[in-house]
Amino acid sequence: MAGVSVESKVSSLVCNLSSTSGLIRRTANPHPNVWGYDFVHSLKSPYTDSSYRERADALVVEIKAMLNAAIAGDGESTITPSAYDTAWVARVPAIDGSARPQFPQTVDWILKNQLKDGSWGIESHFLLSDRLLATLSCVIALFKWNVGDLQVKQGIEFIKSNLELVKDESDQDSLVTDFEIIFPSLLREAQSLSLELPYDLPYIHLLQTKRQERLAKVSREEIYTVPSPLLYSLEGIQDIVEWDRIMDVQGQDGSFLSSPASTACVFIDVKCLEFLNNVMMKLGNFVPCLYPVDLLERLLIVDNIERLGIYRHFEKEINEALDYVYRHWNERGIGWGTRNPIADLETTALGFLLLRLHRYNVSPAVFDNFKDSNGQFFCSTGQLNKDVASMLSLYRASQLAFPGEDILDEAKSFTTKYLREALEKSETSSAWNNKQNLSQEIKYALKTSWHASVARVEAKRYCQVYRPDYARLAKSVYRLPYVNNEKFLELGKLDFNIIQAIHQEEMKTVTSWFRDSGLPLFTFARERPLEFYFLVATGTYEPQYAKCRFLFTKVACLQTVLDDMYDTYGTLDELKLFTEAVRRWDLSFTENLPDYMKLCYKIYYDIVHEVAWEAEKEQGRELVSFFRKGWEDYLLGYYEEAEWLASEYVPSLDEYIKNGITSIGQRILLLSGVLIMDGQLLSQEALEKVDYPGRRVLTELNSLISRLADDTKTYKAEKARGELASSIECYMKDHPECTEEEALAHIYSILEPAVKELTREFLKPDDVPFACKKMLFEETRVTMVIFKDGDGFGVSKLEVKDHIKESLIDPLPL
């Protein structure tokens, strides 16, 4: 403090505190600070070195070029070859009537791309159903053109050696799409060509039975009138197709559900040829299993970039990708590509999730198209199967519910049950999805609510599970190299560590300030400087917001002393004087205060002035009076609670909540950060859209949620200290017949819709800088994490400590 050393303040304070003989003061018995000054200052990150920043900058440039190729195109996509589909295209005869293939380059590709074991497929990913389907398809194509005798022989040997083993992949999640439809059909064709294969295996008969059962459920008439998922596998149902009628459901691009194999199988008119010519012209000598996948690919790219925590580098590219998707969005849902007439649940759910997160106007009514008459959700219209990845996407989308969106509540309930069952199944299964880390994704998603999660921990965890070589299932195993690649992962890890290194330097500044601030002298209060830094830094983590983080942390540390002073240490007479001093905003009035309060008031006065002045510099208008009024309201709320305590008064729940929204202190804390965000101007009109006492906007909802979330985890400890007023106790006073468990359930019934309101306020389009809304929203998310499993501020050595280690202490190995 100016003119007085910290040492003399220490001596004076200790002397005067110990001289209050006969006065019994309550204490919260705070747990000690788990993050020592010496520990924080021992942190030394190598990622402060400029070479890491230079490498990250280079990666950003490389990825931007890659994204421009993927996102700025005209619907094209980058996808790995499908040997299965390429073989079908290779079978198309020349349109001039000569005895040669129309696309001879595909035959050459097949000859050159057989794997060492005699199979065809993606060498890096082995799935037996995929290899068998591709290999048999390639063998038939080569046999038809009487070429590649050696390759045919080796392919047949592979099929003979492995055909019986495919029964071990009989789990639906481990089979390529429509395997039970297509493979028996291919086997019949192979048998008609006298290819020597084991046609009488028990599993083959089982497959044929499954095929018949599935086809028995298909309306033959609907195949020709309504686009059906079976169009994707027409080559597997040639025995039931009326070829002159099937043209009625041909796509505008000439394809059948964007499938090169189906289209090559039909190959009746010039439109089929145009589609195949177009694909061959774009890709050269092979075709993929789907073309195009432009909607799904864009969504997956954006999703991965955001979950890896690197989205701030690619905002322009993300906006272009989502604009493209939104242009093709419709109330029926969307498929994996713009030319696909059938809506797909995974693509639709992911589209809804990302579009809503970016404040596009999308309605959850789209999911009514994916419900059957029993209220169960399925993956695509006309196909009543459920795919784990699709259900996971729907589960994630359901967490973005606004008030009144019952369909999303239904989706959340349904997918939670479905995913739990899938998880139990995966623990005893070697299913493909389990091998691809999907079970880890499910486990984490079910455990961690989006509303109660830490952005930096989420990014770190995703870096740990993200697979650059991730493959997906359709009729073939395929990869999307622009979606999963080494560059994304390297930048994700580098960026996390670089940001963490910046935060560690800021943590040293915070702990140095705290040590010298005088706040540690108040031994009755909790010391949580790092926890409060964590509260803001893990959501508003960008380097340019350092001042916002620092001042937010200062205010939070001050609030903790005030909280414990009003809650436990101060007498009612002392608190009345302190509250009056705050109201008067006059340092001379502090002469009436006890010595410990004099020091507290001086620290308070300096911090409030500092925050107000910094806000004025950032916003360009007078704000000292605004902050003074906010602090006055806040401490008056504290004082009212102190009066309740002194008189053993338990208010009604409504009275408690009205005061608690103010006394929780979240409003003034949030304003001490959001008004000091570098480059983010908040006009008075814009500010009132996120902060208006008594109106359910972001700061009000944050305060309500924080108050009630706090109560659900602290009311027992506070009751043991003699504090009778909590939302639980107040509800029980209003309803004497109810139990504690019923009161707690009622509080949660208030919390849940408030969280939906908060989500709506956060994501609705307006003229408030989105970075400011994000800061307010992210702080709420972290607050909910802190009170998820207990009082994370009061006892910060458990889950909160782990979150701090993950986000601020331990780097990601490169």
Curated annotation (Swiss-Prot):
Top-tier EC class: lyase
Chain's gene name: TPS5
Cofactor binding notes: Binds 3 divalent metal cations per subunit. Can use either Mg(2+) or Mn(2+).
Pathway connected to this protein: Terpene metabolism; oleoresin biosynthesis
One function term, GO molecular function aspect: alpha-bisabolene synthase activity
Keyword annotations of the record: Lyase, Magnesium, Manganese, Metal-binding
Binding sites annotated in the UniProt record for Mg(2+) 3: D710, T714, E718
Motif (DDXXD motif): 563-567
Protein name, UniProt field: Alpha-bisabolene synthase
Keyword Lyase: yes
Superkingdom of source: Eukaryota
InterPro entries, alphabetized: Isoprenoid_synthase_dom_sf, Terpene_cyclase-like_1_C, Terpene_cyclase_plant_C1, Terpene_synth_N, Terpene_synth_N_sf, Terpene_synthase-like, Terpene_synthase_metal-bd, Terpenoid_cyclase/PrenylTrfase
Binding site for Mg(2+) 2: D563, D567
Entry EC no(s): 4.2.3.38
Family matches, as Pfam families: Terpene_synth, Terpene_synth_C
Any GO BP: diterpenoid biosynthetic process
Needed co-factor(s): Mg(2+); Mn(2+)
Reaction catalysed by this enzyme: (2E,6E)-farnesyl diphosphate = (E,R)-alpha-bisabolene + diphosphate
Family per record: Belongs to the terpene synthase family. Tpsd subfamily.
CDD domains cross-referenced by the UniProt entry: Terpene_cyclase_plant_C1
Biological role stated in the UniProt entry: Converts farnesyl diphosphate to alpha-bisabolene. Involved in defensive oleoresin formation in conifers in response to insect attack or other injury. Involved in sesquiterpene (C15) olefins biosynthesis.
Binding site for Mg(2+) 1: D563, D567
